[in-house]
Amino acid sequence: GLLGAPAVATYAAAPAVAYSAAPAVSTAYINQAAPVLAHAGPVAVAHAAPYAVHAPAVGASHQAIVRSLGGNQAVSHYSKAVDSAFSSVRKFDTRITNDALLHAPVAVAHAAPVVSTYAAHAPVVSSYAHAPLVSSYAAHAPLVSSYAAHAPLVSSYAAHAPVLSTAYAAHAPVVSSYAAPVVARTAAVGYSPAAVVSHTSFTGLGASYAW
């Protein structure tokens, strides 16, 4: 074979290198994290056990009585206090008694029955009603008027006119003299004049008599 001559290498001048201005470069970074799934456990609720409050109450009382020398008057004092964790109470009581002054109301109350018993005299006034006695005495007037037919009897007693004019309330002649006219009408019987009879009666307040 033929061996070729080695090629002669020629070097050309390297062109000049020109650099242009670098453009503005903006950088943006994006970070993407993987989603995290976290599940919280349930919250445990704790209940405290109830506790008892021990708050005792403290009480105190005081009483004093002061009497006089004779014991008629007395002054009593009474006080009481109660204290607790939530309240405080105080009470005071003072009383004054005097037994000597209690006798005055007794005297006043005793006078009231005396006045009330005085009203019992009212029936005494009502018993004074003697008016019916006077009215019953007026009943004798019809007796006198009913014997007006006995005029002949009056004429025979002319001598006793003063006696008959004062009181003629004689009841006995009424029976004897009144029967004569009744018999005379039924039969013709002649009668002699009646005997002279005189009766006198009087009735007044506290006195009554007749003959």
Curated annotation (Swiss-Prot):
- Which key words are in the record? Cuticle, Repeat
Membrane-crossing residue ranges in chain numbering: none
MF terms from GO for this chain are: structural constituent of cuticle
Q: Does the keyword Flavoprotein apply?
A: no
Annotated sequence repeat ranges: 13-16, 21-24, 33-36, 111-114, 179-182
Q: What task does this protein carry out? A: Component of the cuticle of the pupa of Tenebrio molitor.
According to UniProt, the name of this protein is Pupal cuticle protein G1A
